[in-house]
Amino acid sequence: PMLDAQADKKWATLQDTPLEFTITRENYSDEMTETVIENKKLNKLLKDNNIEVISKDYLGARVGIVNKEGTNYILKVKDYLPLMAENMPYKDKYTQVISSKDDISQTMVDVDLIEVAGDVGAFRAGITLAENLPNNDKLSLTIGGGRRNVYHRQIRFATSEDAKKKIQERLDNILVKKFHKYYDDTMDHPFTIGHENGHSLGPKEGCEALGKYKSIIEENKADMVSLSMLDLLTKEGLYTKEERDKIIVTFATDNMLKTKPKLSQAHRVRTVMQNYYFLLHKAIKISKDGFLSVNIDKMVEVAYKMLTEIIEVQLSGDFKRGEKYVKDYFVWTPEMKTIAKKLKKISKRLNGTTEQKLADYLFEEKI
């Protein structure tokens, strides 16, 4: 394990490299280990014997070419990370991977993917826009290691005419017309940058006690970091007012799902929780016929409120509290269901496979 940790620590320092090679080790797919927390007798035995339960890793691989121009854009946010850390709720009650006082242990690269395999390339709903690794449970973070953000260029670009047509069709069917001018699919990228760096902010220890809810709560936290810091970063000059508004509306629109997720789907469960939370606090509104309106001026304020509650749950290390928090907000409303039906009519596809033509070409040794 310590060799893995040393490798992770070194990998997270590599900034100026032409290629990206990653063996991903994430445990979102392990639905069994985290349930140990719910067995009180077993959980007590483990604690009495100082045994920490860590979810099983699923191995994946990623190979890509680092895009220098894209990387330089991403690195702009690095100057603002200490300020973001300083503005986190309850910042004095935990240690962050990024702090306002220490060197920033965070590298970032923008990558054109060549190959994804194993867990990364599995048949599923989609490949994430980026990854921030190693995760909190990894040993390297206990020996001074940092983290590395890798952004996937092809995943965020909608280049085909069919893709652009589908986007417009979605807007026409679910978003109130006056908000169309604020929707910009390129604004997913700055939001994702905030999300990935959000994983390096907040508590990095104690979250394992939240069991099967830890990933849902952590993903929720990362989103709310990105959203709640928008006003701060706009004031500091990283974003314009127009970009801020576009990020907010694009986020809210893309948060609408075409089916109710299972509790094991952390990324999608957190989306339902956010939608319900924003509905309750009147930051968004969904009409009975399934059209979304966004209270642009209220979104950041409500996001910070949700972020504060999430940090409280993480700091508690209380499984029951985490369970209650998820169940309180994982509510699939009739309005969400109406939007989902409309989205399904546009596209029924839930999962997909990858095409890797360059990798196939290279594998066949044609060059």
Predicted regions and their residues:
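Short, glycine/acidic-rich hinge or "gate" loops at secondary-structure transitions
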Residues: 12-14, 96-100, 209-211, 235-250
